[in-house]
Amino acid sequence: MVVIDGEHYPPVVEAALAGMAEDGHEVASAVLAGGVEKLPRGGVNAYGDVPVRAGADPRDVLDEALVELRPDAVLDLSDEPVLDYRRRHELAAVALYRGIPYEGTDFKFTPPSRPRLSDVPTLAIIGTGKRTGKTAVSGYAARHLDAHGYRPVVLAMGRGGPAEPELLRGDEVALEPRDLLALADAGRHAASDYVEDAMLARVPTVGCRRCGGGLAGGVSISNVAEGVELANGLPGGLLILEGSGSAIPPVHADVTGVVVPAGIREEYLAGYMGPYRMLLADFVLVTMCEEPFGSPSRSRQ
């Protein structure tokens, strides 16, 4: 599938699509991103054998086409001024949300892998970056879910996590200061998120590590899959997957919550890959609404 615009002369677009066909690509459809300056009156319904889809909002048009056709990839043949940086990222976010790569002349976005690994329902708590309150929200959710009989297990990944996934029975261990000092003396990260989750939520937790973080939240290396396998052996009824920074746990989640600090720059939420995280979200929780981090007016905005 391709994304085109009306800023290009139709013969140029048609020639580009013909060249793709000669190279062995099958173009199922073209989505018009906007622009009518160089289109004939009444628009264009097709370029050769490639039908053109258009509508009021190209994001909706693209989404409908992706769901219907399930292409292998989306190739962006548009350009400024029809697609500026923000609008292009919005279209890329739609494609990634549908699990389809989005690429252009000198870039390619690939949807982060999130396979189904858990034996129980999963809740992901992800954020727009570091210090957003993900661990506090995960602990809060775990406490309340545990109080209502759901027997949650929290899996937290971090840049300082253990080499092998570690189980901490927060429901059994006191985790007093001497316990934390013992962890530190043993060379372990006693302030890791999974330790904090176990101490504050009093539920079993699994600590994992990850390295690297992509624009869409993918991770380069992690032992989260092994951590989920460890969690599958516990008598839990729900697995909470806690993100790290802006990185997303590389595991399928049945429900996803996005933690957004009130003081976040608008561009981090509406631009770049912020729209992708918003598409993943079943709910959004705004944190740090008080001064000096935020304000009531900023939170409402």
Region spans (language model):
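Flexible phosphate-sensing "switch/lid" loops adjacent to ATP/NTP-binding sites
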Residues: 1-88, 93-94, 114-124, 143-301
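N-terminal pre-Walker A segment at the start of P-loop NTPase domains
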Residues: 96-107
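Short loop/turn elements that flank and shape the SAM/SAH-binding pocket of Class I
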Residues: 110
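Residues at the beta-strand->loop junction immediately N-terminal to the Walker
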Residues: 126-128
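Conserved glycine(s) of the Walker
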Residues: 132-133
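Hydrophobic positions on the alpha1 helix immediately C-terminal to the Walker A/P-loop
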Residues: 136-137
